[in-house]
């Protein structure tokens, strides 16, 4: 990353020719390396199940069925060989977690298998998947509450932050419980907390009446807590979605473009991040979070969703690339040691959203 920071300082970020559509087409093609879809053409040229899961619907709609299936085959080959599901896999097929076990890894894997209709892969890896669901249940779930275990720092969408019993992680429990059943896999949740019970517990614990709070012991309004309960389709109530959008807008998390995690810079980050990339996951603007937010907005307000899509179009054509994140003012994020990654696979989501 630091090596790339030096390269960007000297040469700038790579620039693609053409309009926003042409740029995104080239990026998606370049993110396919023959074995799997990597997250970016920059320093994150790795496999992340979270990012792939966010993009799989768009990739399928864009005609990348074979590539998506090969990506899942690649991931399951590595996962089953190592007998674990990790956040990340290197280009040479080594799995590792950034920075610890993440509840959303299994959630996005099961989700991806279902939406891609990969019944053969599910059947082939059924014993392994069922073992991992059992491991997830024993590692993540608090049997007294049906939510994530308290006092544990799981890796998450904000992988540099220390959070306990977050709304996002608890939503991942609901996803695993639901997807396991839908895929016909042995499901330990049916004996304790059913999907419906987990759904009810999430609402009881995190829903304030106007928005989802970030964590069990916090009433902070965050972007991820008010996107993924809906993006995962755990909740589809139109009135709830509209209230969460209003809460996001009140905190200006969608300005100058969506979406920020918080309206301020929290203090709950692991120490090294503050030195290398200050405000990396604070009130900086994340494109993947923004695109998932636009997915949710589109379900209730297509006019607003189109406005957000146009804002990203301007950024794509301005930088001739699709960037990872921006500072709070909407400029490419940079620090002494880090510069926003580019050539993000996430642009596949924008490519589909532009047709709204």
Predicted features, each with a name:
Residues 5-23, 62, 80, 113-168, ...:
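Active-site acid/base region of carbohydrate-active enzymes
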Residues 11-17, 59-72, 114-130, 181-196, ...:
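Structural helix-adjacent loops and short alpha-helical linkers that scaffold large soluble proteins
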Residues 18, 44, 82-88, 144-155, ...:
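Catalytic cores of carbohydrate-active enzymes
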Residues 39-46, 93-100, 160, 164-167, ...:
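Short, solvent-exposed segments of well-ordered alpha helices
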Residues 45-143, 170, 287-293, 297, ...:
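Aromatic-rich carbohydrate-recognition surfaces in CAZymes
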Residues 262-283:
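Generic long, charged, amphipathic alpha-helical segments
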Residues 283-286, 290-323:
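C-terminal hydrophobic structural anchor segments
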